[in-house]
Amino acid sequence: MKKNILITKLQKTIMYAFLLMTMLLVCTCTVYAPSTDSPSPPAEIPGLTYDHSMELSYAQEFSVDYYNDGYALITIDQEGQFLVVPEGKEAPEGLDKDITVIQQPLNNIYLVATSAMDLFRAIDGIDSIRLSGTKESGWYIQEAKDAMETGNMIYAGKYNAPDYELILNEGCGLAIESTMIHHNPEVQEKLEQFGIPVMVERSSYESHPLGRTEWMKLYAVLLGKEDVAEKAFKEQTDKLDKVLASDDIDTGKTVAFFYINSVGAVNVRKNNDYVSKMIELAGGKYVPEDTGESDNALSTMNMQMEEFYAKAKDADYIIYNSTIDGELNTIDELLAKSNLLADFKAVKNGNVWCTGKNLFQETTELGTMIEDIHTILTTEDDSLEELNYMHKLK
């Protein structure tokens, strides 16, 4: 009898152990199984029939669903949905109140998000922008400067201080803001109270450089220029594909990309910032390596020159970011910012380049920028001094 009790207890112990192991195995599989989430089904809109969705190669922060009779629904991650209503049509009755209506034809746009201007330029859409959140002196995109000089585009105040009276008098059909508007939500609320749709763009949150460029397709939907956008975007993807398919894509070369601020600190990109990724796509390796991950709200960081020296002095190439404090033309101008740079390998070997001030406004040409960086890393032509977005310091 005693023996049977012991056997029963042993069997129970084995059974419990087996069940525990099974549960652990199931949990483990659940945690590490790859995601099989399918794309969200298109929204059901009263009176409209879903037709198809826009094909996107790199962009992940927006989507576009097309419906019958030319209607299109734009969805921007964390920022809402926008129904683009064709000219001569009306928004369907019973439309979800959270969906913002944008009526075509779309004119007199108030463009506050500077990165979007070049995307409109690429699709020949600058004429649709009447109001700028940047003054003429702040634009490096020639078409925008020209439009402001002729009066076809006028300054209507920056994101936190718009000229409401001017915006209303000009019959603004849409305000396009960057996520900076979230620091002043009352501005967005007031624009919407005046009946002006507000679209907050998130191109800077794209994980792939060409994801930013692909936002031109979103703006093309607003203007009915999808074919133009497809062609312009393909030009950039073709350039990237050419670089990636090249025999010398794995250069093993290290690249430091930075600028020195007014107090002598070095401003560098974080490891997963899009500039760092462009360097990697071009066949290089970004340094310093331990600058942390970008949280999108802040894709750069400052470090003291001594720390930067220790981590980047052996970089094969230097690309100086001129966007903040102006372009450099000579090595001496660079060394005037810090004499420690004289000991850098890239300076000693004459491998120092500088960006043009238009680099960060021209978001449609990121494929070209990757091509430029690849050329820098692979060229054997010592006489090469000028590229599309970079020039060599002498």
Residue ranges and their predicted role:
Residues N4-A17:
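Bacterial N-terminal signal peptides that target proteins for export
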Residues Y16-C27:
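Bacterial N-terminal signal peptides
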Residues C29-M117, V228-F257, D381-K394:
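Bacterial Sec-exported substrate-binding components of ABC uptake systems
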Residues A72-I76, F82-L168, L174-M180:
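A short, structured surface patch at a secondary-structure boundary
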Residues Q103, G157-P162, S178-P185, E206-T213, ...:
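Soluble non-cytosolic domains of exported or imported proteins
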Residues N107, S115-M117, S132-E143, H183-E186, ...:
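Extracytoplasmic ligand-binding site segments that recognize negatively charged/polar headgroups
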Residues E206-E235, Y317-K394:
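Structured C-terminal subdomain patch of bacterial secreted/periplasmic proteins
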Residues V243-N329:
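Flexible, glycine-rich surface segments
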